[in-house]
């Protein structure tokens, strides 16, 4: 059951990333759709992070603390933790429209979504190993 939830979340991340990378932000509607897909993909990755923290027997806290816990447990490397933190910050900026969202940061983030997906895959594989 838990494994299925991880896989469902991973499929959701893949679907949102594919949408975001396949559509240009050529008008306001498409821009909003792409931003929503990025935001959703990151949120689902953070769900995976929280699920894994729980499966490691740790207390689930805020996203940044959960990322740090995975780093402390040697589940992820510092570069992966930094990637997760950056995307979580971008998600927050999109969700709350901080500082009139810098679209150049979004464009850069679009080019690295495959890296975010690879980290998500790694987390799901780690969870699979824990389940034995």
From Swiss-Prot:
The keyword Mitochondrion appears for this protein: no
Post-translational changes noted in the entry: Modified by cognate antitoxin AF_0948; probably at least 2 successive AMPylation events occur on Tyr-98.
Gene Ontology terms, MF aspect: nucleotide binding; RNA nuclease activity
Active site: 91, 96
Quaternary state and interactors: Homodimer, probably forms a complex with cognate antitoxin AF_0948.
PANTHER family per UniProt: RNASE YUTE-RELATED (PTHR33397:SF5), UPF0331 PROTEIN YUTE (PTHR33397)
Family in the record: Belongs to the HepT RNase toxin family.
Protein name as catalogued: Putative RNase AF_0947
Species this chain originates from: Archaeoglobus fulgidus (strain ATCC 49558 / DSM 4304 / JCM 9628 / NBRC 100126 / VC-16)
Lineage: Archaea, Methanobacteriati, Methanobacteriota, Archaeoglobi, Archaeoglobales
